[in-house]
């Protein structure tokens, strides 16, 4: 049984007459101990979908779903008190920018201990001991003195380590890492990812890794979901997707990598931008940017269908040579 089972999740912003679908009917599962990568450009709905799972979408956002099952609990119908006990304990999240996620008015030790107090209680000494253990676990040197420093006294890399310590404080079963290395330099990025994956294996956590960095997700994830304009356009194992992308958008993302541009003077890029509220096309949402789009693509929205072990949302999925082929059904 899946640890997390998301069915037909949507997130709308704006008024009910003209809502904007930031997330549009996505469904996926995460198994116990699995590392799932969610990739896509900025504006694809990656972060918003995870904030919806965490219950962090405020007005004017509206969340709807057939179900949001964590273990045997539906997060959508869970009463507020029970949800507060579950979110942050069994399900935790690391946010993009540690410098804005930590409260500048409190020491890092206080903030970690506050999370422990909220979810686990215990004595003040036990909470402090656990905080010191966590700071040491995430590789912060001299935790006995760092426990009393404020966020502005730490570097970006150290602040992100504090965020990781706070997220894993209550030993979550599912950890969502939203662009955990975006604000960090390349060397620190590698250290943070190595730490996250080491902790994931040690604690047997499930990990959802949200990123636009395909090289990063290739090394870390077992399975990948590709999102575009709030929709899932492709899903499969990391090996399959990198070896043989089926969706034109996935192909375009991969072709933008330096590894795929050997012998070329310029990297390939996908022209245009992710559509917003007022420029969403009919039919396939990628059709204004897709080099393979047909008149049928411009009129009819494709469904997410199975091609072998893969799921692809395209009328003309790509073959082994990277050329479009009309979909003939399962």
UniProtKB/Swiss-Prot annotation:
GO terms for molecular function: ATP binding; ATP hydrolysis activity. Its main location: membrane. It is a peripheral membrane protein. GO terms for cellular component: plasma membrane. Keywords: ATP-binding, Cell inner membrane, Cell membrane, Membrane, Nucleotide-binding, Peptide transport, Protein transport, Translocase, Transport. Transmembrane segments: none annotated. Gene3D superfamilies: P-loop containing nucleotide triphosphate hydrolases (3.40.50.300). It is found in: Cell inner membrane. Disulfide bonds: none annotated. One of its GO terms (biological process) is protein transport. Residues 6-254 form the ABC transporter domain. It catalyses: a dipeptide(out) + ATP + H2O = a dipeptide(in) + ADP + phosphate + H(+). Its EC number is 7.4.2.9. Signal peptide: none annotated. Pfam families: ABC_tran, oligo_HPY. It comes from the Bacteria. NCBIfam families: oligo_HPY, PRK11022.1. Part of the ABC transporter DppBCDF involved in dipeptide transport. Responsible for energy coupling to the transport system. Belongs to the ABC transporter superfamily. This is Dipeptide transport ATP-binding protein DppD. It comes from Haemophilus influenzae (strain ATCC 51907 / DSM 11121 / KW20 / Rd). The gene is dppD.
